[in-house]
Design a protein with these regions (language model features):
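A cross-kingdom marker for long, charged
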Residues: 1-137
């Protein structure tokens, strides 16, 4: 993309590299309180609920079963971790849910055409069912 390795995207890339090369992958979901785990489940549900209800329920159950190996990570626009959580309005904020199967990634950037307006780059992936491989079966 136009933003690659320039401006705010370079800052997000730097934060992503710092998170992925660190000794920790983030906060283990199974170590969170029940209420905090419910927030992770709600975030994942936003994506899987695009499927029919039977498929969505199956996927969500599989992802929840993997919470003992699922991590949540984020860096704020300053490039620092905050126990208060990510600032979902600030340019440069990066967030990720990474489990045995589920991968959700969100990066916030200022616009190129519309300056000063933050927009979101988001991605959802099921590592076992890429490209609808076996999901239909």
């Amino acid at each position: 993309p136009v933003e690659a390795n320039t401006g705010s995207y370079a800052n997000v890339t730097t934060k992503f590299n710092a998170i992925t090369s660190s000794s920790t992958r983030g906060v283990l979901v199974s170590s969170l309180t029940t209420a905090q785990q419910a927030l992770v489940t709600a975030a994942i549900s936003t994506w899987v609920n695009d499927y029919d209800s039977i498929t969505a329920a199956r996927l969500l159950a599989d992802y929840q079963a993997g919470y003992s190996s699922t991590y949540v990570a984020w860096a704020n626009s300053s490039g620092t971790y905050s126990s208060a959580g990510p600032d979902i309005t600030a340019n440069g904020t990066y967030m990720r849910i990474d489990g045995p199967r589920v991968w959700i990634e969100i990066a916030l950037q200022n616009g190129i055409v519309i300056q000063g307006q933050t927009h979101y780059h988001m991605m959802y992936r099921d590592k076992s069912y890429d490209y609808y491989d076996q999901l239909a079966n």
